[in-house]
Structures are given as C-alpha cells and as structure tokens.
C-alpha cells in the first residue's frame, strides 16, 4: 500500500492508498468496553443504514461530527442512533433534517474538519442520552492533560469493528512536537490538536471518525485523522473545537432559524 497511508472513506465504504493524506475513519485502539451511560453524548452516525462515523450530541437537536463523514451527501442519507452501547442495535434512531460542514474543509489538508447535523425531532434525554457542553472559544488543553476518546472504530490497525462502545484515555500532545512528527509531509494547523501516548498502543482509528475527544467533561476535539493507528511516532489528530466554536454556534443558530422560518 503506497506509503502505508490508509484512507478510509466511511461514507463510501471504500479504502484506498494515497501519498497525500492519511485521513480519518479512525478507531479505538488499546481501549476498554464501556456502557453508553458512561458516555451518553456518544452517537452513531449511520449512512444508509450502516454505522459510518461517530458523533457527539451537544443539544437535543444538534450533533457535531467530522466534515469528512458527511460531506457531499444529503441529510436524508443519514440517521443517528442514540442511547445504545452498540452501533448496530438498541437505542433510538433519529432522522437528520439538515446538515452543514465547514466551507473551508478539504480532504487534502483535513483542516476545519467539522460539521453539524440538525435533528427535526429532538432526542429525549435520560440516563443513556445526554448532551455534553463544548469547550469555550480559544480555550487550550495543557500539554499532558488526560483526554477521553470513545467510539466503535477498529480495535487494531486493519482490524474489525467492535460491537460494544470503546473508551481510551490519552494525554494531549504538544502541538509543536506533533507538527514535528508529521513534518514535512503533513501540516498540523491551529484548528487541530493531537493526543496519544509516547509508547503508542492507544489511539482512535477507522470507524471512530467524527466522535468525541473529551477534556474535563467538555467536548474538546473531534476524531479526524492520523498516520496508521496507535503508532508511537504519530499521535492521533483531532479537530480543535475551541478554535471553531464560533463557527459551530453561528451555524447551529442558522440551521434552527432556517427551519423555523420554513414553518411560516
């Protein structure tokens, strides 16, 4: 496989090699089984009936995910499963009524890898379904602080998906060190953050894309991309929510207003 770069387009169900970017559909490696009550904000983003990406419930009618998970397809191609420890059963299914991805996102750079989904029927909150707060605009995670990543992605590089929700605990990596690790081929921008362990073995991987990275009980990152999975020399790369919080807030408001106005 060219340069060992695995490109997993979960929304298309295709895998191909590329010399340019090792993009997402990331998975949990080195994690542990958990139940949904431990991460009730975690959702499965389903594309035409099958799990394709993770997502995070930030309001009863809003899911945040990665742009590369939903770009170029219609809202009706997606449904959201909430309240289940399993991506293929249980919980409740909700239609996606509309979506927006960042206009400056592109697959070449993976910069601005963020999207929001609007649900015409808000979810019902309970023990297994709950929204999570997002980090504040321009807030920073101190280097070395613990973050939590959850999802149903592959449990090893090139492996299969688990049926039960997984969790992995990884420290936040200094941006300069992360940029040096990926240089000169890949750029770490101000809208990305990195997390992983120096010895490797713990990471997100294929199938986790779009899912949450949580710091101090707030959504701080979105699983985006990486070179391989859980490799010691290459931390996982996440969309930095604090750098894009203003865009998220603005577009949540725009989507809601758009559909309120359509009623009149």
Curated annotation (Swiss-Prot):
Cleavage after Arg-27 leads to beta-VTN protease and subsequent cleavage after Arg-89 leads to alpha-VTN. It is an enzyme of class 3 (hydrolase). Its EC number is 3.4.21.-. Disulfide bonds join 53-69, 178-194, 205-229. It comes from the Eukaryota. Pfam families: Trypsin. Glycans are attached at residue 251. Residues 28-253 form the Peptidase S1 domain. The keyword Iron does not apply. Residues 1-15 form the signal peptide. One of its GO terms (molecular function) is serine-type endopeptidase activity. Keywords: Disulfide bond, Glycoprotein, Hydrolase, Protease, Serine protease, Signal, Zymogen. The active site is at 68 (charge relay system), 113 (charge relay system), 209 (charge relay system). GO terms for biological process: proteolysis. Belongs to the peptidase S1 family. Responsible for the degradation of vitellin in eggs at the head pigmentation stage. This is Vitellin-degrading protease. It comes from Bombyx mori.
